Regions:
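Electropositive phosphate-/nucleotide-binding environments in soluble metabolic enzymes
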Residues: 1, 30-33, 76, 80, ...
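N-terminal extracellular/periplasmic Venus flytrap/periplasmic-binding protein-like
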Residues: 1-94, 99, 162, 167-169
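Helix N-cap/coil-helix junction residues
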Residues: 2, 102, 138, 165, ...
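Short glycine/threonine-rich loop-to-helix capping motif typified by GTGT followed
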Residues: 18-23, 118-125, 150-168, 182-187, ...
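Predominant activation on well-ordered alpha-helical scaffold segments within soluble catalytic domains
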Residues: 33, 37-40, 88-95, 126-130, ...
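Conserved beta-strand-centric core segments of catalytic alpha/beta enzyme folds
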Residues: 71, 75-92, 187-226
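Cysteine-centered functional microenvironments
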Residues: 72-80, 112, 144-151, 170-186, ...
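Glycine- and Gly-Pro-enriched alpha-helical subdomains that act as flexible
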Residues: 94-142, 160
Length: 226
């Protein structure tokens, strides 16, 4: 599969037998646009919402109809699933790379943190990414691949619009809505995925990894392939 290079199999016990667990269990087969459109919203629409604008990705769907009626728009289909997962990365100095004979996948060239009003916590990646780009002396046009964690579809679209992402470069193998969101591991997970995808694409020189954090925070890192 697409993620084989970045997945470490774990042996688990199924009944009386130990078997390798090496495939994500969250992605679901048989999902249709019609089924998605029938799902009920999860959260009430607040009259205090800073930006009640609705983004409709399917034509037609029940999502737009719900929006027109002031009904909830976030559903189980356009929100990330909470699942189990772990990820690991190694960050080393240039001296350590030379001393231990390491072969780095990429160099960290920019990073940033930002905070926004908790009511719009999902857009935290916007100030964080702008800060990281500034530190690296780059613009968004210099970025070849983006891994941006998806809390909800509306949240990720808001970030993409504010940062003017080229969507052909974003979450090219699926984001948290498709793959799931292992809380506490998503930051490392999207970096692992980003670096592996950069290795597969000769033209991909630089990548951006960013995600929102509860309470209004956002974090972003930029990598250059070695």
């Amino acid at each position: 599969g697409r993620f084989d290079d970045e997945i470490v199999p774990v042996m688990i016990k199924v009944k009386k037998e130990m078997v390798p667990f090496a495939k994500d269990e969250y992605p679901k087969a048989g999902v249709t646009k019609e089924g998605i459109a029938k799902l009920r919203g999860a959260f009430p629409v607040s009259p205090e919402s800073p930006n009640p604008q609705v983004v409709n990705t399917f034509e037609p769907t029940g999502i737009q109809e719900a929006a027109d009626k002031g009904q909830p728009r976030v559903t189980a289909a356009n929100a990330s699933g909470i699942n189990d997962g772990a990820a690991a990365i190694v960050l080393a100095s240039g001296e350590a790379v030379e001393k231990y004979g390491l072969k780095p996948m990429a160099k960290l060239i920019g990073w940033g943190q930002g905070g926004v009003d908790p009511k719009i916590m999902g857009v935290g990646p916007v100030p964080a990414s702008r800060q990281a780009l500034k530190k690296a002396g780059l613009t968004i046009d210099d970025i070849d691949l983006v891994e941006a964690n998806e809390a909800f579809a509306a949240q990720s679209i808001a970030v993409a619009r504010e940062l003017h992402f080229d969507m052909s470069k974003v979450n090219v193998n699926g984001g948290a809505i498709a793959l799931g969101h292992p809380v506490g591991a998503s930051g490392a997970r999207i970096i692992v995925t980003l670096l592996h995808e950069m290795q597969k694409r000769p033209e991909a020189k630089r990548g951006l990894a960013t995600l929102c954090i509860g309470g209004g925070m956002g974090v972003a890192t930029i990598y250059e392939k070695c």
